[in-house]
């Protein structure tokens, strides 16, 4: 890209730092390789010598003679409408946005975050609608088939799945006990059966030493 911003009489510059930071000035005369005589009649900057390192050249150029007086500079400035043109540039908008961001509080940052989330959600919804419309327009048969498959899958997901035993057979459905009508007494629980103990076997008495076995 060819460089087109040169130091010349009538060039409008942005003051980046110093006592007049953030203001626009016009170069009236070049003093030497380090300084220039500038004037800002519409930005409250008096005519003075200013170093080049605190100026950033813009694309705007005013037409007035060399070392012109302030009234000629003012007339050329107002005729070119420099203030309105500068406010419409991306450069000025970025500076303004940076200043606003520096002044934001925590609550302001929270509101910005919520607004961004809502914006992104709306954008996603619109993109999905456009994609669906484009799909229907490009291949309506495929879109219908895809919709039918999705409906079948949704219907299959709603059908309850029956339990299958380890042997591969279906488990028998357990019937719930029927509730008795009001007024009927509930059957008593079955009594526990007594378990009969086997008769105890007596040990044989020891024989006398003289007796034969």
From Swiss-Prot:
<keyword id="KW-0687">Ribonucleoprotein</keyword>
<dbReference type="GO" id="GO:0022625">
    <property type="term" value="C:cytosolic large ribosomal subunit"/>
</dbReference>
<comment type="subunit">
    <text>Component of the large ribosomal subunit.</text>
</comment>
<feature type="repeat" description="1-2">
    <location>
        <begin position="174"/>
        <end position="178"/>
    </location>
</feature>
<dbReference type="InterPro" id="IPR039660">
    <property type="entry name" value="Ribosomal_eL14"/>
</dbReference>
<feature type="repeat" description="1-3">
    <location>
        <begin position="179"/>
        <end position="183"/>
    </location>
</feature>
<feature type="modified residue" description="N6-acetyllysine; alternate">
    <location>
        <position position="85"/>
    </location>
</feature>
<keyword id="KW-0963">Cytoplasm</keyword>
<keyword id="KW-0007">Acetylation</keyword>
<dbReference type="InterPro" id="IPR008991">
    <property type="entry name" value="Translation_prot_SH3-like_sf"/>
</dbReference>
<dbReference type="GO" id="GO:0003735">
    <property type="term" value="F:structural constituent of ribosome"/>
</dbReference>
<feature type="repeat" description="1-1; approximate">
    <location>
        <begin position="169"/>
        <end position="173"/>
    </location>
</feature>
<dbReference type="Pfam" id="PF01929">
    <property type="entry name" value="Ribosomal_L14e"/>
</dbReference>
<feature type="region of interest" description="4 X 5 AA tandem repeats of Q-K-A-[APS]-X">
    <location>
        <begin position="169"/>
        <end position="188"/>
    </location>
</feature>
<feature type="region of interest" description="Disordered">
    <location>
        <begin position="166"/>
        <end position="213"/>
    </location>
</feature>
<feature type="modified residue" description="Phosphoserine">
    <location>
        <position position="139"/>
    </location>
</feature>
<feature type="repeat" description="2-1">
    <location>
        <begin position="191"/>
        <end position="193"/>
    </location>
</feature>
<dbReference type="GO" id="GO:0015934">
    <property type="term" value="C:large ribosomal subunit"/>
</dbReference>
<dbReference type="InterPro" id="IPR014722">
    <property type="entry name" value="Rib_uL2_dom2"/>
</dbReference>
<comment type="function">
    <text>Component of the large ribosomal subunit. The ribosome is a large ribonucleoprotein complex responsible for the synthesis of proteins in the cell.</text>
</comment>
<feature type="cross-link" description="Glycyl lysine isopeptide (Lys-Gly) (interchain with G-Cter in SUMO2)">
    <location>
        <position position="124"/>
    </location>
</feature>
<keyword id="KW-0677">Repeat</keyword>
<keyword id="KW-0597">Phosphoprotein</keyword>
<feature type="repeat" description="1-4">
    <location>
        <begin position="184"/>
        <end position="188"/>
    </location>
</feature>
<feature type="modified residue" description="N6-succinyllysine">
    <location>
        <position position="202"/>
    </location>
</feature>
<feature type="region of interest" description="2 X 3 AA tandem repeats of K-G-Q">
    <location>
        <begin position="191"/>
        <end position="196"/>
    </location>
</feature>
<dbReference type="InterPro" id="IPR002784">
    <property type="entry name" value="Ribosomal_eL14_dom"/>
</dbReference>
<feature type="modified residue" description="N6-acetyllysine">
    <location>
        <position position="79"/>
    </location>
</feature>
<keyword id="KW-1017">Isopeptide bond</keyword>
<feature type="modified residue" description="N6-succinyllysine; alternate">
    <location>
        <position position="85"/>
    </location>
</feature>
<keyword id="KW-0689">Ribosomal protein</keyword>
<comment type="similarity">
    <text>Belongs to the eukaryotic ribosomal protein eL14 family.</text>
</comment>
<protein>
    <recommendedName>
        <fullName>Large ribosomal subunit protein eL14</fullName>
    </recommendedName>
</protein>
<dbReference type="GO" id="GO:0042273">
    <property type="term" value="P:ribosomal large subunit biogenesis"/>
</dbReference>
<dbReference type="GO" id="GO:0003723">
    <property type="term" value="F:RNA binding"/>
</dbReference>
<feature type="repeat" description="2-2">
    <location>
        <begin position="194"/>
        <end position="196"/>
    </location>
</feature>
<dbReference type="GO" id="GO:0006412">
    <property type="term" value="P:translation"/>
</dbReference>
<dbReference type="GO" id="GO:0098556">
    <property type="term" value="C:cytoplasmic side of rough endoplasmic reticulum membrane"/>
</dbReference>
<keyword id="KW-0832">Ubl conjugation</keyword>
């Amino acid at each position: 890209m060819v460089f087109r911003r040169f130091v010349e009489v009538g060039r409008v510059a942005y003051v980046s730092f110093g006592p007049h930071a953030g203001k626009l000035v016009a170069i009236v005369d070049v003093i030497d390789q380090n300084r220039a005589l500038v004037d800002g009649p519409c930005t409250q900057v008096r005519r003075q010598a200013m170093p080049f390192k605190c100026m950033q050249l813009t694309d705007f150029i005013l037409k007035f003679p060399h070392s012109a007086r302030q009234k000629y500079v003012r007339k050329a400035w107002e005729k070119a409408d420099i203030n309105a043109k500068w406010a419409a540039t991306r450069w000025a908008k970025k500076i303004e946005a940076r200043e606003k961001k520096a002044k934001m509080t925590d609550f302001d940052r929270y509101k910005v975050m919520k607004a961004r989330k809502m914006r992104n959600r709306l954008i996603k919804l619109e993109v999905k609608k456009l994609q669906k419309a484009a799909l229907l327009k490009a291949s309506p048969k495929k879109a219908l088939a895809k919709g039918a498959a999705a409906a079948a899958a949704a219907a299959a997901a709603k059908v309850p799945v029956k339990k299958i035993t380890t042997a591969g057979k279906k488990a028998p459905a357990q019937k719930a006990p029927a509730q008795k009508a009001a007024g009927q007494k509930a059957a008593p629980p079955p009594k526990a059966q007594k378990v009969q103990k086997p008769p105890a076997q007596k040990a044989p008495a020891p024989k006398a030493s003289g007796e034969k076995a």
